[in-house]
Amino acid sequence: MAFLLHQARFYTTVNHLRDLPPTVQPEIAFAGRSNAGKSTAINVLCNQKRLAFASKTPGRTQHINYFSVGPAAEPVANLVDLPGYGYAEVPGAAKAHWEMLLSTYLATRSQLCGLILMMDSRRPLTELDRRMIEWFAPTGKPIHTLLTKCDKLTRQESINALRTTQKGLDAYRDQGVQGKLTVQLFSALKRTGLDEAHALIESWVRPSVADEKNEPVAQ
């Protein structure tokens, strides 16, 4: 999947659900709080410096950005960069637009095959992170959490963050969530967890290929 993601390019930007492209390829959504490192993670995963852009004013970007991956003539999937959330200075109208846009997209988009949820490893599972899970979990599709910026933690702090997040996800399973809920440590700066994330994304987009390679998938 590393080579597949490295063939990523900008496809389109939409600001309303009615403008979502009528594509047939599977989609993988990337979501996370403002300043959780979402754009940086997408760029590192795709081995590009400026594919995804972070807004100069965190939380102000309210668009959905699509990136196609695979051969340009026959893309095999789309990466979907969702607006960042949780920034205190965002006006109320923008917050309402964000909530409608994301909740409806996550709950109803048939092409969506999984959600990559970025959480700052220093403060995982905020209220808004949980809201994202609760919007998407009823679909039964998988959610994989990247605990970003783990290079800022000590080894023990990283272990604690992973355990705390896993425990929080286990609580959703206990409540009857059927989709897979997995988590890993990730650092764009140190490239920690890059291969693990690539393998998991490939298992979503091309499960038969992943099975043949017997790629490990995060638990």
UniProtKB/Swiss-Prot annotation:
Organism domain of life: Bacteria
Binding residues annotated for Mg(2+), in chain numbering: S39, T61
SUPFAM superfamilies documented for this protein: P-loop containing nucleoside triphosphate hydrolases
Record-level GO cellular component terms: cytosol
UniProt KW keywords: Cell cycle, Cell division, GTP-binding, Magnesium, Metal-binding, Nucleotide-binding, Septation
Alphabetized NCBIfam families for the sequence: GTPase_YsxC (TIGR03598)
Gene Ontology biological process terms from the UniProt entry: division septum assembly
The keyword Aminoacyl-tRNA synthetase is assigned to this record: no
Domain EngB-type G: 24-207
Names of required cofactors: Mg(2+)
Protein name per its UniProtKB record: Probable GTP-binding protein EngB
Organism per entry: Burkholderia multivorans (strain ATCC 17616 / 249)
Cell cycle listed as a keyword: yes
Any GO MF annotation of the entry: metal ion binding
Residues engaged in binding GTP: 32-39, 59-63, 81-84, 148-151, 186-188
